[in-house]
Amino acid sequence: MFVDQTKIDVQAGKGGDGAVAFRHEKYVPLGGPAGGDGGRGGSIILVADSGLRTLMDFRFRRKFKADNGENGRIKSQYGRGAKDVRLKVPMGTSVYDFNTGELLGDLVKNGQELVVARGGKGGIGNIHFATPTRTAPEIAENGEPGEFRTLRLELKVLADVGLVGFPSVGKSTLLSVVTKAKPKIAAYEFTTLTPNLGMVVLPDGRDFSMADLPGLIEGASKGVGLGIQFLRHVERTKVILHLVSMDPNNGRDAYEDYETIRKELAGYTKDLTSKKELIVATQMDIPGSEEKLAEFKKKLGDKTVYPISSVTHQGVSELMGKTADLVEEVAKEEAEKPAEIKVAEKEYVYKKPEDDGFKVERTGEHSFIVTGNKLERLVQRTNLDHTDGIMLLARKLKRMGVDDALREKGAVNGDDVSIADFTFEFVD
């Protein structure tokens, strides 16, 4: 089954907690600090794989979770970091944040990686908190939570050439003639329900990939027929072969069909109509097709038309040669364009923008809540089981301006203040 869209949940692992431990050493208070750091939590990574053609693997399993990092140990030993979870996806997969719609990355090259949920950092142990005046610190950090994200995966077929047109204009037949692909072919509309891919190899050694896309009809860009779910596959093609039937018995106006498809491409995105296009008049082996072709050319004006018959192979070689020329031309133009965004071929890590701000809100007569990404992470990473940890957090909150902000909102001694899942009394 061809699956080109899916939704998945990814949960990275939590970082391990730092340890509070002490050495047994003569004349050193409590033996000296010896608590090791926690290990990093596992990340979730998508990897482009040239051997896959569909998102079928995600149809029945849609939740993925990486392991947590190990906690720090005694004797200054670090906890082990968790293994990353690597999920293989087809080349051509676009990854979106499901909730915001933001494009996180495009996986278009074999082996390219995208980190979609980062594992939490491990907390540091008490060996890092020793000072000349605090020789036996009972402070360690908790590990950071791993990121959670809901993703929308969308596969856009990677092909140099896309075949577009109304149903039953001969797209699948042409693909079967010029490649080794074996698409389903029948004399009824919408025989092709999923994109078919094939490789065209010319006698001169040139080659290019070709995709036969399901037939479009009027209103496709708004979801009519197979519609918009397949229009996106045209986006990555370099060249469009626009097939128009010259069968005089189908009761259709060739020029109107051509204009309708062009309108639907533009309705999806203007970028599609700016692609290189070859107009292909198909089914030229049918009696009466020459007259229909002449009328079609007259209405088109000065645009070039390539008449072919996939049955007799009339004009097919010339069409493939011209197509190869255009593919090379577009590839050269793309290579000469300055890259707008540089993306590493091997690994592209999506990172959330850092938010240093915070907000104070009154939730009751004597209660307040303070929110902010950086602030909440600070609280989550502080080990609140030890007095030293609580005192350190209080000093950091004061330096960040939280105390002053609470006073401005009217906080007084004894009021409750909540940050993340931690609640404490305000002391002025």
From Swiss-Prot:
Annotated OCT domain residues: 350-428
Binding of Mg(2+), residues: 172, 192
Pfam families registered for this protein in UniProt: DUF1967 (PF09269), GTP1_OBG (PF01018), MMR_HSR1 (PF01926)
Single biological process term from Gene Ontology: ribosome biogenesis
Subcellular location: Cytoplasm
Entry keyword set: Cytoplasm, GTP-binding, Hydrolase, Magnesium, Metal-binding, Nucleotide-binding
Protein function: An essential GTPase which binds GTP, GDP and possibly (p)ppGpp with moderate affinity, with high nucleotide exchange rates and a fairly low GTP hydrolysis rate. Plays a role in control of the cell cycle, stress response, ribosome biogenesis and in those bacteria that undergo differentiation, in morphogenesis control.
Subunit: Monomer.
Name used for this protein in its record: GTPase Obg
